[in-house]
Amino acid sequence: MSFKDLRSFIDHLEANGELKRISYPVDPHLEMTEIADRVLRAKGPALLFENPKDHHMPVLVNLFGTPKRVAMALGKDDPLALREVGELLAFLKEPEPPRGFKDAIAKIPMFKQALNMPPKTVRNPPCQQVIKTGDEVDLTQLPIQHCWPGDVAPLVTWGLTITKGPRKSRQNLGIYRQQLLGKNKLIMRWLSHRGGALDFADFKQQFPGERYPVVVALGADPVTILGAVTPVPDSMSEYAFAGLLRGERTEVCKALSCDLEVPATSEIILEGYIGPEELAEEGPYGDHTGYYNETDKFPVFTVTHITHRKDAIYHSTYTGRPPDEPAMLGVALNEVFVPILRKQYPEIVDFYLPPEGCSYRMAVISIRKQYPGHAKRVMMGAWSFLRQFMYTKFIVIVDEDVNCRDWQDVIWAITTRMDPKRDTVMIENTPIDYLDFASPVAGLGSKMGLDATNKWEGETNREWGTPIVMDPKVKQKIDSIWDELGIDDSPTL
């Protein structure tokens, strides 16, 4: 099932018991965070606060608070089915030439579908049903969440920031948090390596002193939102990818103040510009690490137009110590990454980003080991293959007999198959998450690789241990007599 806009997804969730409407007046200042946090930790539904205190616009939170709802947003019934999305991305990233005539015929539908999914421009879009300019622009009228007691100001969290570099043929969609600075100003917190920041830097170089047009879409359709956090090939727009997943072209419209294209069914659109040198101190904010981050200067986004649907819905979230919504999103997208990594490294059996690791700071990978040093090759490849893993600080490599998603298994492998000196790889002065205050320098830190695989000749001079395994015939016999033993509530091994 596909969803053309956020509202149709809300209806679908409600019909399936995955959304709860809250009519009680709840304050966007701290109260929504506390409620959403409790519900997420209980694996509860998405929440629609219909009467936010001192505001007239409903607030939607916890939309992607379970892997199941992430899968539902992409038209799947189960998070494991998201591997199909990963297989599609793996194909689009590195399409294989046909192995013969039959293979070429089989691949035609996929190529044709990919080529036929450019966005569709529409007139009179829903997102421009209400238009506010000049003195009418007032961001304080939006029910923007103030998430934590130590946060400096309310924070826009789920906005899709739309930019375009002067030398690029396609737009970039990114999700960057934005601090409320005034009635018409937000601080655009994009790090220097992110797509929006790169587009802006390129624009300043090409057109020094000029204003850079930027648009932020709030409450886009769920597939487009998730497309912005998925490793879409650089040659393909997030709109085209969203259309491919939806099976229907993404509807877009021209912004009123510039040539940027925005999702036509979005709930709210913020249009404006970033001045060449206007910066402001951003933060502190409670973040996905579970700590308040440091402050730093980032560009100021001046909003000149606010357009929105009639009876618009404000989409929001909070970030905090895992589990939070980004962590749940990471659990679901984990399944997308597996086929992409396998495409490059077929020896990978499974891949896991534990949510306790703040979504991406630790990865555990199981492999079919084939030669000495193989684990180190895979860990280096994982760090460099996808930009999503640039900030992964720790990678643990285990053999295929170890379940990389089971900490008991992983800890057993680390403690029995590793020598701390021989099997630890340390790399200094690598890109690191700006929010990681444990690094010695902001944005620059080290990485650690742990080779917890069985060691081959050349990696050790000692005879390697043989794992203890029960005789299969004995196991089979005990299975057959288990009920007669009268041992209640014990598992069959």
Curated annotation (Swiss-Prot):
Residues the entry annotates as binding Mn(2+): 172, 238
Residues in a coiled coil are none
Q: How is the cofactor bound?
A: Binds 1 prenylated FMN per subunit.
Q: Name one GO biological process term.
A: ubiquinone biosynthetic process
> So which cofactors does this thing need?
prenylated FMN; Mn(2+)
What residues form the catalytic site here? 287 (proton donor)
Q: Tell me, what's a Pfam family for it?
A: UbiD_C
Residues bound to prenylated FMN are 175-177, 189-191, 194-195
Oligomeric state and interaction partners are given as: Homohexamer.
Please state which protein family the record places this protein in. Belongs to the UbiD family.
Q: Report what the protein is called.
A: 3-octaprenyl-4-hydroxybenzoate carboxy-lyase
The gene it comes from is ubiD
